[in-house]
Structure formats: C-alpha cells, structure tokens
Regions:
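A short, Lys/Arg-rich alpha-helix, primarily the initiator
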Residues: 1-12, 50-53
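Residue-level recognition of specific faces of alpha-helices
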Residues: 6, 31-34, 55, 72
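Short basic helix-loop element that most often maps to the first helix and adjoining turn
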Residues: 7-20, 82-83
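A generic secondary-structure micro-motif detector
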Residues: 8, 41-42
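Residue-level detection of the helix-turn-helix DNA-binding "recognition helix"
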Residues: 12, 26, 37
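Short alpha-helical DNA-recognition segment
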Residues: 17-34
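DNA major-groove recognition helix of helix-turn-helix/homeodomain DNA-binding modules
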Residues: 25, 39, 46-63
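Short, charged recognition helix plus adjacent turn
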Residues: 54, 58-85
Length: 85
C-alpha cells in the first residue's frame, strides 16, 4: 500500500513538482493534485496509481512499507561501478 504522504515525500526527494510527476507518469496534473489532497492510501483508478508509483520507482525511489516504524520513502542506493585497468 502506498500512501499520499509517501507520494509527496517521494516528490520532495526527487525535487519534482506535481506537474513533473504528471508529465513523467502520464497522469494529468489535476489528477495528481486531487489524489494528493486526500489523506491515506493512494486512491483513484488502479492504473493511475500504478503509473504514479512506476514513475517514482523508475526515478530511483523505494517505498518502505509500514512495519511498526512507519511507512516512508528513500532513494535507491546507486551501485558503484568499478573502474577497470
């Protein structure tokens, strides 16, 4: 389950506006704004929620499930490339 707070936090980590998320997910900006205005689980149509989540995950954000410590987001650790000599 992804919450609207996680979506907002993910946008903040990425430095994205609602317009940026809309463009990258293929969802209209008014839809992003409407979905973010409702507290709780990300609602709307299932396909819309999947597009939003996929855009954010594709940009390197991991969603952290509620596990007693609270749900959240974090940036994926980038793999280090070793230089070859």
């Amino acid at each position: 389950m992804v919450t609207t707070r996680q979506i907002k936090a993910a946008r903040a980590l990425l430095g994205w506006s609602q317009a940026d998320l809309a463009k990258r997910s293929g969802v209209s900006e008014p839809t992003v704004a409407r979905l973010e205005s409702i507290e709780g689980e990300l609602g709307g149509r299932e396909l819309t929620a999947e597009k939003i989540r996929a855009a954010i995950e594709g940009a390197g954000v991991l969603f952290i499930d509620e596990n007693g410590g609270g749900s959240g987001v974090r940036l994926r650790k980038r793999s280090k490339q070793r230089s070859r000599k």
